[in-house]
Amino acid sequence: MTPQEFEKLKTAAKEFFEQTGLALEVEIKNQADSTIFVDVKAEEPQFLIGERGQTLGEIQRLLRAVLRRKAENPTPFFIDVDVNDYKKKKTEYLKEVAQTAADEVAITKKEKELPSMSSYERRVVHTELASRPDIATESIGEEPERRVKIKPRP
């Protein structure tokens, strides 16, 4: 993505959040892996995060659709929106839960299923545990009840 294209998308993203009417600080960064990271600081974050981050997920999908329409260049890019470090904290929590569950599976040699999670949350767990040679992970179930199963490796 060119610097000019990024500036155009950055402006569109700021306008998107200005239309909420909420008191927000929005910082937008272009990351090396074609990801546009949108960091939002809000006085009332609950309106943007929602229950279990569902509103935040929908805002991210809507913003992605808006920016893809504004993009002149068909170069693919990703959008990552975080509000008051909600996703950052959630990711750290998920990594901790994943490692704890994996340790339990490695010791007991019994499978363990984690609670239902969004696709983003499942990806965090799979990525966190991918380098462990003693366990394997797989997603099971149907949306919205999809979850991660952690299994011992022989």
Which sequence ranges carry the predicted segments?
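RNA-contacting regions in translation and RNA-metabolism proteins
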Residues: 1-154
